[in-house]
Amino acid sequence: MGLPDASGDLSSEMEVDAFRRLFPLRYFERHLSESIRPDARPLGRARDTTLALGAVASAHGSALAKIGSTTMLAAIKMEVMTPSTESPDEGSIAIDFHMPPICSPIVRPGRPAEAAPVISKQLSDTISSSGMINLKELSLVSGKAAWMAYLDIYCLDADGALFDAALLSAVAAFSHLQIPIVSLNDDGKIELISEEDDGAKLEVEPVNKEKRKLTLSGIPFSLTCILHKNYILADPTAEEESIMETAVTVVLDSSSRLVSFYKPGGPVLAHTSAVQDCVALTRQRVKELQNILDETLSGMEID
């Protein structure tokens, strides 16, 4: 009995790889005809997803989210601000999405990634319209002091479905967030209580006596789908996004209420039946993500 032809196997692998690079769409369509993707996922299945809380020790709330290889690091810093005259009893949230060159070969040093401001706006609109955060919970002294929550999200690996992973990291960071203790000084100004003073007896009555968490409701989750001919691919990789142009992103909250629907472009119109299928896939995905978030929160040690 002869030995396996290793050179033949290697040659075959090289031919497949060459075909994939030269004719990427034909390569993918061969897999789609078998209802499978090159990474062995069924068309409607998302990639493995993980969450880690407290990833940034210096932040008031932080999380690391991974969907497949796509990786996002979210960190929240709280600062005291003067609220606007229009909303004297509300705080504010500022969101910035960053794509450093390390995240993708298409991002070049010195040139801001085109997707970054778009995703920043999508995140701001989604978190605002979902009603996840009651801005009144960020108020300290009516008309005088309120919290400004600065959320920065860094893309560490951009392998597709960036908005989905960014939103998940944002939701997880706000779930992990602990509002710092503050007090009024003799001049009537708000001061943060340092960690050293945290357990000490305060001469001035603190505005909030202990660290607290926000009450989150209607938490939004999203799923991006690629529409190609009669196929719908959930949670696309960067390679799939580059080959098949039409993408839609559905955002639902934890009660399956539609928060938003994004279709950034592409030549194919999203027909009603395709949209309904994407919404159905998103409902299933929301349950998965809610379970992942709940399990991560329950496994976290409370200080």
What are these regions (language model features)?
Residues 1-303:
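Polyanion-binding surfaces on beta-sheet-dominated domains and ring/shell assemblies
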